[in-house]
Amino acid sequence: MLLHESAASMEQSMPENLSTHMYGECEVNPTLAKCPDPVNVDHELPTKESCASTTIVSTSPTSATSTTKVKLSFSVDRLLGSEPEESHRQSSSSPSTKSCCDGSILACCSFPHCFSQANAESRRFGHATLPPTFTPTSSHTYPFVGLDKLFPGPYMDYKSVLRPTPIRAAEHAAPTYPTLATNALLRFHQHQKQQHQQHHHHQHHPKHLHQQHKPPPHNSTTASALLAPLHSLTSLQLTQQQQRFLGKTPQQLLDIAPTSPAAAAAATSQNGAHGHGGGNGQGNASAGSNGKRKRSWSRAVFSNLQRKGLEIQFQQQKYITKPDRRKLAARLNLTDAQVKVWFQNRRMKWRHTRENLKSGQEKQPSAVPESGGVFKTSTPSGDGTPQEALDYSSDSCSSVDLSEQADEDDNIEINVVE
């Protein structure tokens, strides 16, 4: 039995597509082939099964060999699930018929390890066998079974045994990080939805919630284990946002959300207004404290030197060009936008002064383009006119006053013109 099983395993290990013993229980006649050495003989290469069967027949008596082979065929057929017809045929066969009938490779051999064993083994391993009606023709007139084992055919693809292996390995391989993150995100949303539903149920039915919360501890632990990479991502994002928020200066934070009263008081003291612009400065600070501030930048406070330089340039040209404005901003250590806004406010005040002089005052409009000192000395009379001239001088008020006064002048000018 060990010889038969080893022969069957040897047959299964080799590709059985075009092997000559596959189409019938064929065995090489011992009178034709005596298991020659494959080194000396190249074209006559009998199989190992034929050699094994030949040694069995030669070393034992005829009657004992027949009985033992009958018993072995019954036991092996019962183990491997072969057809009963083959076993009856093997049991009824005599020792003289247990070899090839005419010596051809497609003869009617009855040894159990030729075709029935290979057929049962192939059925057990799930390989396709050739239907019995198909009988291929062979051009060889002598038993030639060696080279057929070396060429695979279309009847049994031995690569099918190896093909599922990399697919299974790819399926069971460690998933990539994007796959983990996506799956964790989906599970996180489902978990949050379940918690939301349980929270709603807890508000309406608080007594039944304790019964519902007893089974889910295992689910919560598994969800926390699955959501570990997602929690690490969210914590990383939170730390980055905190670092971004803490990296800003207090002034930037004040510009973003000046809601506290201390910040409003600081803004009021910074924008502290003198003279006529005081009320408007406080109003803007209170509006900023309420979150209704329209401008996202704080108003700059110019020094006396900067105001004098701006005023001198304004007296020379009311409408400054872009190159001159950039040069002036670089010389006074200001930005281009600050110089532009200051000139706009100053022109608005200048127009307002001109409109007031045209409306009934005795002041000549030609005296206005000169410097502020000349303007103050040239006023002959009038109590309100010197005070208004002091408001327009560069030394008596800050740029905040000029900007606030520009807002008032803008409204007044619109009312007058329209």
Swiss-Prot record:
GO terms for cellular component: nucleus. InterPro entries: H2.0_Homeobox_TF, HD, HD_metazoa, Homeobox_CS, Homeodomain-like_sf. Residues 259-273, 391-403 have a biased composition (Low complexity). It comes from the Eukaryota. The keyword Nucleus applies. It is found in: Nucleus. One of its GO terms (molecular function) is sequence-specific DNA binding. Residues 295-354 bind DNA. It holds the Pfam family Homeodomain. SUPFAM superfamilies: Homeodomain-like. Its main location: nucleus. Expressed in cells of the visceral musculature and its anlagen. Residues 190-223, 259-296, 354-418 are annotated as: Disordered. May play a role in pattern formation during embryonic and imaginal development. Is not essential for visceral muscle morphogenesis. This is Homeobox protein H2.0. The lineage of its organism: Eukaryota, Metazoa, Ecdysozoa, Arthropoda, Hexapoda.
